[in-house]
C-alpha cells in the first residue's frame, strides 16, 4: 500500500489540497493518507490553555477525516508538534510514508515558508515532497463554517434547531465548530466544559450536522477571539440565557465580538429550562 503523508493546518480545507488528494486517490490503486496537523497557538488572550490549543488542531483532523470519508478516501490523522518540521519528521519516523504533501499559505503569508520548511523536509527525509499553495483570501473555502459559542445553553433545543435550519438552507456543505468556554480556572471547570461540549456534539451529530468542538478560555470574549484566530469562519452564533439572567449580555459580548470580526454574528436566546441540565454553571 502507498501511504501519503499530508501536512497542513489552516489551509487544510483548501480546494487545491482536496483536489490533489482526490487525484492521488484516483491515480494510485491502493493508497492511504496520513494527516498531520501541527498545533498552532492563537495570539489573543493572556492565558492560552494547552488543552484548548490541542483541541483546535484535533477539530481540523476530525473534520478533514470526515471529508475524506465522504470522498471515499482511506485516511487517518493525528495532531502534531507545534513545530511543523518536528511534527513532520515524527510522522515520517513512525509511518514511513512513500511521499509527502505539504499545504501552506502563499509565501507572503506563510511562516512555514519563511522557515524553509519544504526544503528542510525534503533534505531531511529524502522523500518526494509536493507543495500546495492555497490562498484562502482569494479562493475561499468550498464549504461554510459556523463558529458556535455557548455554555449553559449549549444543548438548548432553540440553538440546535437554529443550527439545523442553517445547514438545511445552505447550498454548500456547512461545518459547525462549537466552543464551550470554561466557567473559571478551577480544577472542575475543564471536566464540566467537556461534558457540555459532548452533550452538544451528540445532539448536533444526531441531527445529521457535521460538527466538532473544543473547550475555550473562561472569558467568553477571549474564547471567541481565539477561535476566530484559529479558524476561518463566515458566521458566528452566540447563544445565551435571556437578557436579565445573562452575564455574557451584561458584558456586551455580542457587540464586542461583532467589532472583532467581519463575519456575521447572530444571537440565539435559550431559556435555561430548555438547556442542558445537571452541570453547575455561572450564567452565560
What is the predicted role of each segment?
Residues 3, 99-101, 145, 235-237:
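Structural motif
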Residues 126-140, 262-280:
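Short, flexible loop segments at boundaries between secondary-structure elements
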Residues 71-99, 209-235:
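Structural beta-alpha unit
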Residues 63-73, 169, 199-209:
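Short helix-loop-beta junction
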Residues 104-119, 240-255:
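Glycine-rich, Arg-bearing micro-motifs that act as flexible, cationic patches
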Amino acid at each position: 500500500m502507498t501511504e501519503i503523508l499530508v501536512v497542513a493546518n489552516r489551509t487544510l480545507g483548501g480546494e487545491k489540497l482536496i483536489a490533489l488528494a482526490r487525484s492521488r486517490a484516483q491515480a494510485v490503486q491502493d493508497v492511504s493518507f496520513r494527516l498531520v496537523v501541527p498545533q498552532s497557538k492563537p495570539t489573543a488572550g493572556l492565558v492560552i490553555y494547552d488543552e484548548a490549543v490541542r483541541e483546535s488542531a484535533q477539530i481540523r483532523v476530525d473534520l478533514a477525516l470526515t471529508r475524506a470519508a465522504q470522498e471515499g478516501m482511506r485516511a487517518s490523522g493525528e495532531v502534531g508538534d507545534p513545530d511543523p518540521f518536528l511534527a513532520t519528521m515524527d510522522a515520517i519516523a513512525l509511518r514511513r510514508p512513500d511521499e509527502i504533501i505539504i499545504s501552506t499559505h502563499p509565501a507572503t503569508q506563510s511562516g512555514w515558508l519563511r522557515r524553509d520548511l519544504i526544503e528542510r523536509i525534503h533534505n531531511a527525509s529524502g522523500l518526494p515532497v509536493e507543495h500546495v499553495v492555497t490562498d484562502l483570501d482569494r479562493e475561499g473555502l468550498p464549504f461554510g463554517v459556523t463558529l458556535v459559542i455557548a455554555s449553559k445553553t449549549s444543548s438548548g433545543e432553540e440553538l440546535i434547531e437554529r443550527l439545523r435550519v442553517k445547514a438545511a438552507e445552505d447550498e454548500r456543505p456547512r461545518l459547525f465548530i462549537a466552543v464551550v468556554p470554561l466557567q473559571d480556572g478551577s480544577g472542575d471547570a475543564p471536566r464540566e466544559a467537556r461534558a457540555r461540549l459532548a452533550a452538544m456534539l451528540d445532539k448536533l451529530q444526531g441531527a445529521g450536522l457535521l460538527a466538532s468542538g473544543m473547550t475555550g478560555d473562561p472569558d467568553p470574549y477571549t474564547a471567541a477571539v481565539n477561535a476566530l484566530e484559529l479558524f476561518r469562519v463566515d458566521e458566528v452564533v452566540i447563544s445565551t440565557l435571556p437578557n436579565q439572567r445573562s452575564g455574557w449580555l451584561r458584558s456586551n459580548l455580542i457587540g464586542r465580538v461583532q467589532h472583532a470580526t467581519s463575519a456575521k454574528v447572530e444571537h440565539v436566546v435559550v431559556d435555561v429550562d430548555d438547556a442542558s441540565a445537571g452541570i453547575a454553571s455561572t450564567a452565560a
